């Protein structure tokens, strides 16, 4: 195992070999969970380490946690982040449909975990409605944001740092390039906006961060190809730029350079991009789905719009882009709102949960 020791006092990452040393599809990783569990057991035995509690993330790690719980006889808490049944319900393409093995695995995790952490009350409702979960075993603790990394940067400084040609009013999308993320609707909204903007008005543009925009005959990213085709179809070459992936350390500059950040997803269990943007003092326009409906406060930190409604999305984006006073007001309110999600606050809630689970009452 490869061990990293640079995460601060009491923290380290241990890389456990499991499966072949080749790139695997997500659905193939499941087969190697037994190898992963065995590697963890051998590592702890060889190092003489006794763990008190397991905190697993995402469903496959939850399956591993069940096996480790059996071997070590210790409690575990789990956070799903996304749910298979929800992804099935909103899937736009066949490849986005989750296998039944995932859903049965999630149910198994629900039956074994000492506590389930949900990001929002929306996720609690989904666990009850779709999985018949015991909500007495579920606690809401949202993900946190690093306020030392994501904070407001003066717009001119941010635009100078990112060194990409940006327009006077810049919209920003950050995330994976897949149908579930709703980028097709965003391009439709941009096309509507282009028709509404007067020639003499300050122009706007959309910057898309994520994926690989360099298409070749061997490209397997069909969604990126589809979106670039739509950009041409709608004559948006001067309005939309696909930048590809960017280093995490540069994201605060992109967020701060933007007039608004757009999250047009069909499903988000939480919406980390929205939280990072708000921490940088940038208002967010997001779909009214899942965690986004709780995270983005309509008319206060940004706007929420019905999913699959490009016209409503265009209307809200236009309002933010061309009402400077409103944009500044919502941006300041967004930064203030995001402070409650700082890791200092969230970490305390997680530590309190650990103490509860480790106590006698928590293990009953």
Model-identified regions with their sequence ranges:
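Nucleotide-activated donor-binding/catalytic signature segment of Leloir-type glycosyltransferases, i.e.
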Residues: 210, 219-246
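Conserved acidic donor-binding segment of nucleotide-sugar-dependent glycosyltransferases
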Residues: 298-299, 303-310, 319-324
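Aromatic "clamp/platform" in nucleotide-sugar-dependent glycosyltransferases that forms part
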Residues: 266
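A conserved catalytic-core segment of Leloir-type glycosyltransferases
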Residues: 1-51
